[in-house]
């Protein structure tokens, strides 16, 4: 239960108050506020990102690295708005929407939110199951059941409190970091080409624009927007406007660090694909093919690192999806079901799809299409609410933030419409 657990993890601890009072500074002052952004950041390294980044790197080399950098900057702003909403109001995004919108609108938003969670779970479970299949040769159906059991184990951390969950998720994020850092080291990318790809925007034909749209469009995940506002709403509660502003400054640093890590992981996926596949004239779209090629071009260790990264990213992001679903139901319709019941219900569609024998990469693409539908329903209300002084008080967006946010929203929604049309063309 999201709110209850967050509250339980938000005592007026001496460390928090000393940091707000300025008695402790630097990293010691920041430490009590670290955590929420690391949970939200898991959404940015889900298996859908694996497929998109590897396709981009294998087909166009380092050329589209700048798109990942730009996407990360956009995500940084959007996640900061979500966190700020929770800090300013003490409510999550769906709760504010329920108060501000008519009941039929809230019910409609809840339904589309649940569809987003199902699509999210599909992507995460396929990624985790594929990781098990690639690493151990376990058939996909059995692997998906093992992945389901693993996701229940991760949720058990939440019963011990949100600090335990934050530590567990951060640990899993660290595993993915190590896996792709080693992969990048083994791939021996060209440093000059990496820097050019990061800072010199370029395209090469229509297909490169389409892949760039895929990277941008898949960057902002709707469930991460809902969840981040819940992670900050009662974790540390400011008594005054000044304290709330300080809390947001600390949380912004938390977001900056977490998104930097997530961005580095996404960039490393593309870099490794460019250094190995593009260099050897291989266009790789399927994750199982990528795994085999890592083993062939580098070593079995490189292939294993890829499989481990995919498995851990899938497991951790599936648990984050479950937490987001709890926020969506509680916020939009003020109703809850036990977290483990929700987990059980949401694993059924992915397991059925895997059992049907659908190609994993095809299923990942279709899940991203469903997620594309949900972005506007999370992003537009978020910008509306954080630009409203009645709701936000002194933490209202600066005018330039509002303008930039709307431009980003228009860009992301337009790109996702474009991707949906292209998928079914």
Curated annotation (Swiss-Prot):
Induction: Repressed by MntR in the presence of manganese.
The keyword Manganese belongs to this UniProt entry's keyword annotation: yes
Superkingdom of the organism of origin: Bacteria
Presence of keyword Transcription regulation: no
Single GO term (MF): cadmium ion transmembrane transporter activity
Membrane topology label: Multi-pass membrane protein
Biological process annotations from GO: iron ion transmembrane transport; manganese ion transport
Membrane-crossing residue ranges in chain numbering: 30-50, 61-81, 107-127, 134-154, 167-187, 209-231, 255-275, 294-314, 344-364, 365-385, 401-421
Keywords from the named record: Cell membrane, Ion transport, Manganese, Membrane, Symport, Transmembrane, Transmembrane helix, Transport
Location(s) in or outside the cell: Cell membrane
Membership in a protein family: Belongs to the NRAMP family.
Name of protein: Divalent metal cation transporter MntH
Phylogenetic classification of the source organism: Bacteria, Bacillati, Bacillota, Bacilli, Bacillales
């Amino acid at each position: 239960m999201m709110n209850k657990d967050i509250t339980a993890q938000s005592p007026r601890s001496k460390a928090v108050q000393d940091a707000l009072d300025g008695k402790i500074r630097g990293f010691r002052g920041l430490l009590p506020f670290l955590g929420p952004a690391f949970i939200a950041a898991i959404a940015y390294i889900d298996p859908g990102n694996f497929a998109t980044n590897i396709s981009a790197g294998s087909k166009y080399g380092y050329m589209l690295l700048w798109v990942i950098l730009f996407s990360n900057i956009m995500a940084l702003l959007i996640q900061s708005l979500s966190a700020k909403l929770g800090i300013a109001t003490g409510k999550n995004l769906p709760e504010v929407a329920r108060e501000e919108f008519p009941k039929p609108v809230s019910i409609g938003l809840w339904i589309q939110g649940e569809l987003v969670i199902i699509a999210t779970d599909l992507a995460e479970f396929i990624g985790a199951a594929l990781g098990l299949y690639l690493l151990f040769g376990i058939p996909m159906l059995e692997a998906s059941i093992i992945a389901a059991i693993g996701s229940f184990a991760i949720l058990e951390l939440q019963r011990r409190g949100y600090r335990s969950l934050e530590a567990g998720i951060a640990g899993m994020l660290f595993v993915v970091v190590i896996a792709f850092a080693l992969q990048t080291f083994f791939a021996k990318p060209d440093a000059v080409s990496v820097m050019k790809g990061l800072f010199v925007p370029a395209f090469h034909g229509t297909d490169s624009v389409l892949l760039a749209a895929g990277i941008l469009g898949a960057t902002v995940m709707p469930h991460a927007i809902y969840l981040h506002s819940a992670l900050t709403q009662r974790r540390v509660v400011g008594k005054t406007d000044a304290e709330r502003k300080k809390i947001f400054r600390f949380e912004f640093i938390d977001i900056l660090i977490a998104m930097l890590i997530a961005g580095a992981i996404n960039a490393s996926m593309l870099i490794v694909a460019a250094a190995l596949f593009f260099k050897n004239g291989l266009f790789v779209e399927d994750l199982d093919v990528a795994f085999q090629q890592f083993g062939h071009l580098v070593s079995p260790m490189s292939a294993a690192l890829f499989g481990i990264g995919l498995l851990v990213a899938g497991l951790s992001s599936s648990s984050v999806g479950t937490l987001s679903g709890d926020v969506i139901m509680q916020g939009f319709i003020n109703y809850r079901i036990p977290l483990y019941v929700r987990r059980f219900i949401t694993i059924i569609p992915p397991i059925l799809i895997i059992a049907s024998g659908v190609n994993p990469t095809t299923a990942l693409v279709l899940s991203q299409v469903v997620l594309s539908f949900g972005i506007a329903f999370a992003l537009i209300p978020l910008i509306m609410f954080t630009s409203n002084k009645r709701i936000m008080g002194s933490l209202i967006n600066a005018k330039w933030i509002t303008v930039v946010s709307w431009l980003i929203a228009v860009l992301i929604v337009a790109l996702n419409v474009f991707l949906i049309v292209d998928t079914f063309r």
